[in-house]
Amino acid sequence: MKTTYVNATIVTMNEQNEVIENGYIIVENDQIIDVKSGEFANDFEVDEVIDMKGKWVLPGLVNTHTHVVMSLLRGIGDDMLLQPWLETRIWPLESQFTPELAVASTELGLLEMVKSGTTSFSDMFNPIGVDQDAIMETVSRSGMRAAVSRTLFSFGTKDDEKKAIEEAEKYVKRYYNESGMLTTMVAPHSPYTCSTELLEECARIAVENQTMVHIHLSETEREVRDIEAQYGKRPVEYAASCGLFKRPTVIAHGVVLNENERAFLAEHDVRVAHNPNSNLKLGSGIANVKAMLEAGMKVGIATDSVASNNNLDMFEEMRIATLLQKGIHQDATALPVETALTLATKGAAEVIGMKQTGSLEVGKCADFITIDPSNKPHLQPADEVLSHLVYAASGKDISDVIINGKRVVWNGECKTLDEERIIFEASRYKRGLQR
């Protein structure tokens, strides 16, 4: 099946960050086979031609760190620092989860993400009360591209920890698929919730199965102080001593990194999932993304969960990411629009090991989203496309979402998830949680 999308303004995010006015994209099954400017002559003998009527077409956004199973917890635990938020709000509520509630919560997060332009994401879920196979089936049904990872903790007894490691290894062996729509990573929660032995076992699993690692690291000053007091090392050095960086690793946050740590992480191919809104809301601080990029680190933007954000809008994350860097450095050139877009598309895709997506180029997967600026005053005049995408647009502006060549959202309607049912069930399950 060959389909051509014509009469579009195409934000390619190729090496030149080329924007093609009045262009077209030809998709064959799940791949892009041509991207050009001008009128379409049907040289490829396509099956269908779709007039985009001047819509902006850009790569699907890539969320490098989130927790979709937590989506029912939106608005619970506002105005709290990370540790009391986790210990007195999030973990007690997660302990009440059931498989049915977890699926309902996941569906809500998936619906919000895909309708706001996210096509790929990397996720960590707490396995308490969760049917991991049901979660993977739910993500698959959404049509999204994802790395969904089972989180490990050292809570409970040593036998509990051993069982958690065994279950996580089975999960990795079952779901790791480097080139598929769904895959997984090895995901120890953090250095303050995992024992040294557990972190070492996670490193072993990652090396033996050739997977990536996903971990919360250097998120707060308190974490750095506590880990240094307990182990005599800062979190980066401690994680390295456990062997975690033997495989490409995504660290969520990286708010508290010094110059030497940034250089070390760049050298060891450790990438950062930057969560600006979540870090601000939890009072964790502001990650120095400008310095990370200058050190050669790979960085991708992320939302974290709705419980700490409180939405999954990647456009909002792009905007706050660039504004924060300009503000803390007092440098208006810090993180310009092209870089912000890169960190939410092809750069983010590279961070989570999904190089097959993130730009609109021949050979890439057909993952793209559209915005119709014609009826949106906040996107007019419509000639400064890149600027408007970062500084003016929002996830609410999305018209269409194509993932792997399939129309997942069309004219604002999600084709893979039942929006009315999901919203109804989210409210019903939320009422059953005891605060």
Curated annotation (Swiss-Prot):
HAMAP family: MTA_SAH_deamin. NCBIfam families: PRK15493.1. Zn(2+) binds at residues 65, 67, 216, 304. It comes from the Bacteria. It catalyses: S-adenosyl-L-homocysteine + H2O + H(+) = S-inosyl-L-homocysteine + NH4(+); S-methyl-5'-thioadenosine + H2O + H(+) = S-methyl-5'-thioinosine + NH4(+). Belongs to the metallo-dependent hydrolases superfamily. MTA/SAH deaminase family. It is an enzyme of class 3 (hydrolase). The keyword Repeat does not apply. Its EC number is 3.5.4.28, 3.5.4.31. Binds 1 zinc ion per subunit. This is 5-methylthioadenosine/S-adenosylhomocysteine deaminase. Its cofactor is Zn(2+).
